Amino acid sequence: MLSFHQLKFNIYQKQLFDNLSITFLDSAITYIKGANGCGKTSLLRMIAGIMQPSNGNIFYKNLNINNIAKPYCTYIGHNLGLKLEMTVFENLKFWSEIYNSVETLDAAIHYFKLYDLLDEKCYTLSSGLQKVVALARLIACQSDLWLLDEVETNLSKENRDLLNNLIVMKANSGGIVLLSSHTENHIKSAQILQLT
């Protein structure tokens, strides 16, 4: 379970949200929607512990996220978290070791069909393939909370379908997935959190 209690966030003297209280139960898929600048990315970054709210608390599994050892979630944002000078395999191995989940590395490579790219330096890949390598972390790094910030950008239809299937599988296994998106909701069973 993930919950916000009276969350408030101001940036550059602009209030993005005030007194935001909501609970996401296990197995939830939620699209965070809203206009540019309404706080979608900021909210995901706060849940990930990268930013702090101006006021209020965020709880995951009934613990304040400030008191949980990191990493407790997998966050993929605009900065994909790739070491561009490293190979695809080195990047995935690096992240799986941080999450103590090396045993899932092969599954990540197989699911996103990365075999032919394993020895490629990430800087040689297109932005779409770099995004796929970052998304492979969802399998390589075992966590029950996924925070995905506009991850469908630059993805082929095939990889978008793989991602959506993976999100549904994560929710079906009890995980929580929050994703911001400017595109149509591809997962019809997902709920919508509209920020204004």
UniProtKB/Swiss-Prot annotation:
Keywords: ATP-binding, Cell inner membrane, Cell membrane, Cytochrome c-type biogenesis, Membrane, Nucleotide-binding, Translocase, Transport
Pfam families: ABC_tran
Listed InterPro entries: AAA+_ATPase, ABC_transporter-like_ATP-bd, ABC_transptr_haem_export_CcmA, P-loop_NTPase
A molecular-function term among this protein's GO annotations: ATP hydrolysis activity
Residues in ABC transporter domain copies: 2-195
Subcellular location per the Swiss-Prot or TrEMBL entry: Cell inner membrane
Entry EC no(s): 7.6.2.5
Enzyme class: translocase
Cellular component annotations (GO), alphabetically ordered: plasma membrane
Binding site for ATP: 34-41
Biological process per Gene Ontology, one example term: cytochrome complex assembly
Quaternary structure annotation from Swiss-Prot or TrEMBL: The complex is composed of two ATP-binding proteins (CcmA) and two transmembrane proteins (CcmB).
Biological role: Part of the ABC transporter complex CcmAB involved in the biogenesis of c-type cytochromes; once thought to export heme, this seems not to be the case, but its exact role is uncertain. Responsible for energy coupling to the transport system.
Family stated for the protein in its record: Belongs to the ABC transporter superfamily. CcmA exporter (TC 3.A.1.107) family.
Name of the protein in question: Cytochrome c biogenesis ATP-binding export protein CcmA
Gene name as annotated: ccmA
